């Protein structure tokens, strides 16, 4: 579908240009900067919603709202944007999560202008990545995230923030090298004039050995972001030290960039290599679920416990994509959106607990259920959502991944049975570490009592943020077609099934 207005360029550019305007805002405290940034985020989300309702056709199974402009001719880089069901779902998630993360950052009082500037730059870069139709532009948007996250970690992180930020940069930059080499190889192979346009690259073919090498190059970059075991070790350190509003963006959006790349590039452009390596992806995804769950159970720091739970849940995304079935891929897409909501909400809850106690150590906490019933109720409800309680979004997504594995025609019965058993063990381990965390936080001895100055229950702003997360979690769980009716339009053809 073609529109006279370049809507995608507008939603990519608006946060970036709005962020560049922050230095000229009045310097009379933090209030103006806060409300300005929140207003931009709300405006951006309203524009995304408008585009979805007025310019996007769910029944049209192709890229819509295409925009292509020459940008840098010397390197054949085009400003090429387009949107389909996969990208639209993640764009909506990005707008929703970023708006609530901005509101959650209200207590920050140090260098607020720089903080909100970095958040807006991240916002524009994430939207740009999900709508890119040029593989070099995709890489450019991929790299935009690096500096804002590094600075957010360094300036507003915990005691080990420099170590965590450096580790994040090394992992991400290392993966980006593989991504760039793979993208250049794909674009230059067999062409006198290189083309980075994804639509053109769909029709290119490669020798199988070269296709596998290109696939692995992309996979390494995505394995860092997603993350996939064993490239995950940056994530617990980063989440453990970052401010909780930054964690909301990391868990809610940043991790989904890897899953999006696996579907958009590896599955769509490198189908034969994906068929060959899909079983390995499923195996590593299953190992990741078990491994991260076991490590999570041993964490005394409950923020790191939530971080390891994120790694475990993203294993279902890897399995769903590797299943090579439409059901499994739909489950992976739904799991990305579901975890984006649940993970961001849990990190916000972890931050609200820290604001009151100044500690993340479970053995120093307990007894909060009586003095803070609202916090207890929301933490319990969202933890149940994380362990895939029926009626919540996580249940539907994990069920679809299970069904995708079982119904796949590409793998032997023994292999599918083994993956299914490992997934089942993971779903059993999840309530163990989550319910144990709830018990240590809210029961036990009375750290929180009526005389304790930290025993302050959730305020209106915090309740509003959590309810905003909870409503779509329940909505998707009760009526998953809210997402599947959008996401199913973009599933690439699977000629080998």
Curated annotation (Swiss-Prot):
Listed EC numbers: 7.1.1.-
Domain of life: Eukaryota
Pfam (any one): Proton_antipo_M
InterPro entries according to UniProt: NADH_Q_OxRdtase_chain4, NADH_Q_OxRdtase_chainM/4, NADH_UbQ_OxRdtase, ND/Mrp_TM
Residues annotated as transmembrane: 5-25, 36-56, 88-108, 112-132, 135-155, 168-188, 212-232, 243-263, 275-295, 306-326, 331-351, 387-407, 418-438, 463-483
Topology in the lipid bilayer: Multi-pass membrane protein
GO CC, any one term: chloroplast thylakoid membrane
Catalytically driven reaction(s): a plastoquinone + NADH + (n+1) H(+)(in) = a plastoquinol + NAD(+) + n H(+)(out); a plastoquinone + NADPH + (n+1) H(+)(in) = a plastoquinol + NADP(+) + n H(+)(out)
Coiled-coil segments: none
Protein name: NAD(P)H-quinone oxidoreductase chain 4, chloroplastic
Source species of the chain: Adiantum capillus-veneris (Maidenhair fern)
């Amino acid at each position: 579908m073609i529109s006279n207005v370049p809507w995608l360029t507008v939603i990519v550019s608006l946060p970036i240009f709005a962020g560049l305007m922050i230095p000229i805002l009045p310097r009379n405290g933090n209030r103006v900067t806060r409300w300005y940034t929140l207003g931009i985020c709300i405006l951006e989300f309203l524009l995304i919603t408008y585009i979805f309702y007025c310019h996007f056709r769910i029944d049209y199974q192709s890229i819509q709202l295409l925009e292509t402009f020459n940008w840098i001719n010397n390197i054949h880089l085009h400003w090429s944007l387009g949107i389909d069901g996969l990208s639209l779902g993640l764009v909506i998630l990005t707008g929703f999560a970023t708006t609530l993360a901005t509101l959650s950052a209200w207590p920050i009082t140090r260098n607020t202008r720089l903080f909100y500037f970095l958040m807006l730059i991240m916002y524009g870069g994430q939207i740009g990545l999900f709508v890119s139709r040029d593989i070099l532009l995709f890489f450019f948007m991929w790299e935009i995230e690096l500096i804002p996250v590094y600075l957010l970690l360094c300036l507003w992180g915990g005691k080990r923030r420099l170590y965590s930020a450096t580790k994040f940069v090394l992992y991400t930059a290392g993966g980006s090298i593989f991504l760039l080499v793979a993208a250049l190889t794909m674009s230059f192979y067999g062409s006198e004039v290189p083309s980075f346009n994804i639509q053109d690259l769909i029709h290119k073919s490669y020798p199988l050995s070269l296709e596998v090498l290109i696939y692995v190059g992309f996979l390494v970059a995505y394995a860092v972001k997603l993350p996939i075991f064993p490239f995950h070790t940056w994530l617990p350190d980063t989440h453990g030290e970052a401010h909780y509003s930054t964690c909301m963006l990391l868990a809610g959006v940043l991790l989904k960039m890897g899953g999006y790349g696996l579907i958009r590039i590896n599955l769509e452009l490198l189908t034969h290599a994906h068929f060959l390596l899909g079983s390995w992806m499923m195996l590593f995804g299953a190992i990741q679920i078990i491994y991260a769950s076991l490590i999570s159970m041993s964490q005394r720091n409950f923020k790191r416990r939530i971080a390891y739970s994120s790694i475990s849940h993203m294993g279902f995304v890897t399995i769903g994509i590797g299943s090579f079935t439409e059901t499994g891929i739909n489950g992976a897409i739904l799991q990305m959106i579901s975890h984006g909501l649940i993970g961001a909400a849990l990190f916000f809850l972890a931050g609200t607990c820290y604001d009151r106690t100044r500690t993340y150590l479970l053995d120093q906490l307990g007894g909060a259920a009586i003095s803070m019933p609202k916090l207890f109720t929301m933490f319990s409800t969202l933890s149940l959502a994380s362990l895939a309680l029926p009626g919540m979004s996580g249940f539907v997504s994990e069920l679809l991944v299970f069904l995708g594995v079982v119904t796949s025609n590409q793998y032997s019965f023994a292999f599918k049975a083994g993956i299914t058993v490992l997934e089942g063990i993971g779903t059993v381990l999840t309530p163990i570490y989550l319910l144990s965390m709830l018990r240590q936080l809210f029961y036990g001895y009375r750290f929180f009592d009526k005389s304790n100055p930290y025993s302050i229950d959730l305020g209106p702003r915090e309740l509003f943020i959590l309810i905003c997360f909870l409503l779509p979690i329940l909505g998707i769980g009760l009526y998953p077609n809210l997402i599947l009716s959008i996401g199913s339009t973009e599933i690439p053809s699977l000629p080998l099934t």
